[in-house]
Design a protein with these regions (language model features):
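Acidic, polar-rich low-complexity tracts and alpha-helical solenoid repeat scaffolds
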Residues: 2-14, 22, 27-272
């Protein structure tokens, strides 16, 4: 029975040793020898065991792009073999190792479309989520991929909550949501600098409402104090400052918010 790798290797920690460990875990009972090494992956009719083993060996030696192509050949040449199912998921993993994340996603999705109830479905969903996660860029760029990573990680957690994949997905979700909140904060600050206070208020409120467990919430509340005062809403500013103080006492953003309200709306502070 095939045992797929539990934790796909990350982009910044990929190694030949781990690749070899992954490959060795995929040895199948009755597997034939590796045979000769083809110069490329052009179509050459080969028996399924030889072809699969060649793909596995290429992966173990760190040649993930060729391994992926060879695993694809297993399915193409032997579509009705039990090896084809194994090769589909190993193709997805090989593309992931090769940092060809779009193909990794496509291969894993193909596996799930054909084998939705397979025992390795949790791994396929997890691999899709990681392939999106690895493509997350800095907050200055479009966050479409980040949203896709968030959706995919949530799907892993929803479908397989008791698995180790879900445990890791939850950890990554925290990072993803912090990233998305950071983007909202960047846009909100831009609107503030442009004097578009209502637009800024909407962004900061979104952080407070939808990303309240992230590290950006204290600043978002402070920015809501700022924008409320700029809009001539001192009572709203006081409300946000109070929420900030109740949830983050001693935080530098609360100290700044308190001072700001004291300077801009001293009568409200005196009345409190």
């Amino acid at each position: 029975m095939t045992s797929f790798p539990k934790q796909p290797v990350r982009r910044n920690s990929r190694s030949l040793l781990l690749g070899a460990a992954i490959a060795s875990s995929l040895v199948l009972s009755g597997c034939a020898g590796s045979g000769g090494e083809p110069a490329d992956t052009a179509y050459v009719a080969r028996d399924v065991e030889t072809l699969y083993t060649e793909a596995r060996d290429r992966l173990s030696r760190g040649n993930a792009p060729v391994a992926a192509a060879l695993f694809d050949e297993v399915e193409r040449q032997h579509p009705y073999s039990p090896w084809a199912r194994r090769a589909q998921l190993m193709s997805a993993f090989s593309y992931y190792v090769a940092a060809d994340y779009n193909k990794a996603i496509q291969s894993a999705q193909r596996f799930l479309s054909i084998h939705p109830g397979n025992k390795d479905a949790p791994y396929a969903y997890y691999l899709i989520a990681l392939s999106y996660y690895e493509q997350i860029s800095d907050v200055q760029r479009d966050q479409k991929i980040t949203e896709q990573a968030r959706t995919a990680l949530r799907e892993v957690n929803r479908r397989f909550p008791a698995t180790e994949y879900a445990t890791d997905a939850r950890l990554k979700l925290d990072l993803v949501e912090d990233h998305l909140a950071g983007k909202e904060m960047e846009i909100g600050r831009y609107y503030q600098d442009s004097g578009k206070w209502i637009a800024a208020q909407i962004r900061f409120q979104n952080v407070v409402d939808n990303f309240q467990t992230t590290s950006h919430t204290p600043e978002a509340l402070y920015r809501l104090v700022e924008s409320s005062l700029a809009l001539g809403l001192p009572s709203e500013a006081k409300k946000y400052a109070a929420v900030l103080g109740a949830n983050y006492p001693g935080n530098e953003w609360y100290e700044r918010a308190y001072k700001l309200v004291q300077d801009k709306a001293p009568s409200l502070v005196a009345a409190s």
